[in-house]
């Protein structure tokens, strides 16, 4: 079951909750919607493990949660704790920019990265989910995709957030720019009605093609893993890939078939720090997880518990610590395939102690300079403050946040995943008749090679983590930057 935020009420019999903590003995699933969580629980009831449940939930959420900035045209940060080996696994779920999307090309034609199709990246979510399913799951793609296919083909009830988000004036205007998008998301040229069944036949057809490819492979004697690969190939190398590329090109995008066909999601080791007896893991620096770890290192020097939960003093310290971490993020953090990220220095306790000296427990600062984790300096002496325009560009984005899911099975395996498709619904680009609503993650690139997030370096905005205590007690943590729970 999924545990929701709970509300305490004072009554004649003491304090009680209308939405109490939910306890499970054989597994738990938390997701962005009730149906997302139920999808994962159904997989656990059928004998699947935490990875099977997470993949199924993520596929279902990709159908039902475009208003939470997540579609099957997005990306995912995915961590898996293998209880038997007591090892945390990670997979790269962030797609790359097309090969023709160079700094010179953008500067020559636009002088910036325009919104829309020119700020997109190859979707990484399907690749990453199926890589994890193949390596650590037990089920087939068709089993994991059953609920998602059902929600796409037969529909799901339009819920309040879904209706309200689609119905905003700016989103409706952008959806109307694209006939395929308007046809799906604006039936009768208006937002879906509350409770009405929302059907996505094109998306169901795409998922069905993937299922059929797997079934054909299995029918020819292929292994479970080869069947999953066959399903993946439909999306990245087959007819669906070609139709997505054609749609992107028609929209003015810089994609070629090879941008999809050559994309892969490699496994990698996570990064981690300890915080007051807990070991906290995140994906590497293609996400912002490293900023969370730096923040925890800085905060470890304060007794937040003594200040009171969410007290002004405690919140002040957390906010200022985040600012310190973000300053280093802008200076040093990017795709480690292209940028020499000083992981050891950034994550060291010594460096955190140096950065902590800049924090005033009584006063807030608008921003901080980065430090120098290589030379162990609290402030980088070569730092030049950005212009006001650069600061505005660095903020960017849509403030609604994204979705999240967590699963744990009876064996103690667990998954923490943050799937996202930054700005997908806001830009409203459904790719032809595939039903895939495309991300706009590329808006986070810089057109300056001095920046660690320049165009060759995809940077994902989501951050999630998993933390373990003595590798026996477990929890998953999702950091939305305004509430830790």
Please provide the spans of the model-predicted regions.
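Active-site rim segments in enzyme catalytic domains, especially the processed small/beta chain
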Residues: 63-70, 74-81, 85-90, 246, ...
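Noncatalytic scaffold domains of N-terminal-nucleophile
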Residues: 2-38, 42, 48-230, 235-287, ...
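Hydrophobic, well-ordered secondary-structure elements that form the walls
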Residues: 277, 295, 325, 412, ...
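Internal maturation/activation junctions in enzymes
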Residues: 6-7, 189, 241, 253, ...
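A short acidic/small-residue loop/turn micro-motif
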Residues: 96, 422-424, 485
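Active-site Gly/Thr loop motif
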Residues: 252-276, 356-357, 361-396, 434, ...
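Short, well-ordered beta-strand elements
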Residues: 29-30, 90-93, 279-284, 291-296, ...
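Generic recognition of flexible, low-complexity loop/linker segments
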Residues: 66-67, 192-194, 230-234, 259-262, ...
């Amino acid at each position: 079951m999924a545990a929701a935020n709970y509300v305490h009420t004072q009554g004649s019999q003491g304090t009680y909750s209308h939405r109490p903590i939910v306890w499970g003995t054989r597994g738990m699933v938390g997701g962005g919607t009730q149906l997302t969580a139920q999808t994962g629980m159904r997989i656990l009831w059928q004998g699947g493990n935490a990875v099977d449940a997470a993949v199924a939930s993520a596929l279902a959420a990709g159908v039902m949660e475009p208003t939470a900035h997540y579609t099957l045209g997005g990306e995912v940060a995915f961590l898996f704790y293998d209880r038997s080996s007591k090892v945390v696994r990670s997979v790269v779920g962030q797609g790359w920019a097309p090969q023709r999307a160079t700094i010179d090309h953008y500067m020559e034609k636009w002088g910036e990265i325009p919104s829309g199709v020119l700020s997109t990246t190859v979707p990484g979510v399907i690749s990453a989910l199926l890589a994890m399913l193949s390596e650590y799951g037990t089920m087939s793609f068709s089993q994991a995709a059953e609920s998602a296919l059902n929600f796409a083909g037969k529909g799901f009830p339009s819920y309040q957030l879904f209706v309200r988000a689609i119905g905003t004036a700016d989103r409706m205007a952008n959806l109307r720019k694209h006939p395929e998008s308007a046809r799906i998301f604006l039936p009768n040229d208006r937002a879906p009605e509350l409770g009405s069944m929302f059907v996505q036949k094109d998306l169901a057809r795409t998922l069905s093609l993937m299922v059929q490819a797997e079934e054909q492979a299995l029918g020819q004697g292929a292994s479970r893993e080869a069947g999953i690969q066959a399903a993946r190939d439909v999306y990245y190398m087959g007819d669906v890939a070609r139709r997505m590329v054609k749609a992107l090109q028609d929209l003015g995008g810089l994609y070629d078939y090879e941008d999809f066909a050559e994309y892969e999601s490699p496994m990698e080791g996570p990064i981690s720090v300890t915080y007051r007896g807990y070991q906290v893991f995140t994906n590497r620096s293609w996400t912002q997880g490293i900023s969370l770890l730096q923040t925890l290192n800085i905060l470890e020097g304060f007794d937040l518990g003594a200040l009171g939960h969410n007290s002004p003093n405690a919140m002040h310290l957390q906010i200022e610590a985040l600012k310190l971490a973000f300053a280093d993020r802008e200076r040093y953090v990017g795709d480690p395939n292209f940028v020499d990220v000083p992981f050891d220095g950034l994550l060291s306790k010594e460096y955190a102690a140096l950065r902590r000296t800049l924090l005033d427990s009584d006063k807030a600062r608008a921003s901080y300079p980065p430090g120098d984790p290589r030379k162990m300096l609290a402030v980088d002496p070569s730092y030049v403050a950005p212009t006001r325009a650069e600061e505005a560009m660095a903020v960017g984005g849509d403030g609604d946040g994204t979705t999240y899911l967590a699963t744990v099975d009876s064996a103690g395996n667990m998954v923490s995943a943050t799937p996202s498709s930054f700005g997908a619904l806001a830009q409203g680009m459904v790719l032809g008749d595939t039903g895939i609503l495309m991300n706009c993650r590329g808006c986070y690139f810089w057109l300056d090679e001095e920046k660690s997030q320049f165009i060759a370096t995809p940077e994902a905005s989501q951050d999630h983590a998993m933390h373990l205590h003595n590798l026996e007690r477990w929890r998953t943590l999702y950091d939305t930057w305004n509430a830790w729970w």
